[in-house]
Amino acid sequence: MLYFKCAQPVPGKGEAWTLYECGDDQTVLRTLTHIPVTGEVTRVPDPIVKKLYRPEMLQPAEAEEFTALWGEG
């Protein structure tokens, strides 16, 4: 599995981090969005978009980070 993340600002809430869980071929399997300031986590177990868009803009992420956030709730 491969894991990636990216951040973008959300007005009034701070940074929103989107994390991607991908197969070895970079097919997106699951995604989640986490806003650390508010503690919000939105999980998408079967995302509509299955291909990473502009993967060169993403940062590597750790499996532990993704699974810890996925298990919250």
Predicted regions and their residues:
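Assembly/interface hotspot detector across virion components, adhesins/toxins, and nucleic-acid enzymes
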Residues: 5-7, 20-22, 58
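Short, flexible N-terminal segments of the mature chain
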Residues: 11-38
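Small/flexible residues
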Residues: 4-7, 32, 45
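Negatively charged, low-complexity tracts enriched in Asp/Glu with abundant Ser/Thr
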Residues: 1-13
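Intrinsically disordered, low-complexity segments enriched in small/polar residues
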Residues: 1-2, 18, 51, 64
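Short, compact, well-ordered microdomains
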Residues: 51-73
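Short interaction-prone segments
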Residues: 34-57
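Short linear sequence motifs
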Residues: 10-13, 46, 59, 63
